[in-house]
Amino acid sequence: MALINEHFLKLPGSYLFADIAKKVNAYKVSHPQQRVISLGIGDVTQPLCPAVIEAMHKATDEMASKASFRGYGPERGYDFLREAIIKHDYLSRGVHIDPSEVFINDGAKSDTGNFQEILRWDNSIGVTDPVYPVYIDSNAMIGRAGVYEAGRWSSVTYLPCTAENNFIPSLPNHRVDMIYLCYPNNPTGTVLTKEELTKWVNYALENDAIILYDAAYQAYI
């Protein structure tokens, strides 16, 4: 008999940003005269820039011609795109990596969940607090987060980011297998220095841990 993954039933509710959207819409209905400044999900607010529009038109024209039409792309992404990423995002910062280390995906949210497929379910995890909810939810859905009680998961190590510590988390006081870091941080906006990040790398090396680093907002710095 096919059985449902019981860990889905442990999730406390729907996706956080969906709940926020419902509350915002309800407020707009009851307060139509008020202007709402959304600080929820980071949706776009401006139209596409000319360079992006030009590239999309060019790609569409290529797909419309038998001579230049192409089907599925390579499983890791097109070489020209991976090489451009290395050139502009890594070599420009003095970082040398091999093209085999670059994968083209469909966003951080998808791969945050996809990483779970290659890591054991009983690895321990550490997250900054507050944190982007997908990091925890994706682990909860495979049973790695434990039991949800009083707003906390029993098997998750929470690393407080408060005004008292300038929103900079301390290293865990015990071994953690998987560490989620996002800097510039969502939602605090904090940026860690190279020296502060080095502490995390050293911790990971000393404890045979993995750092899952989300650099979604690196362009801000």
Residue ranges and their predicted role:
Residues A2-D106:
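N-terminal small-domain helix-loop-helix segment of the aminotransferase-like
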Residues A67-D208, L212, Q218-Y220:
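Conserved core of the PLP fold type I
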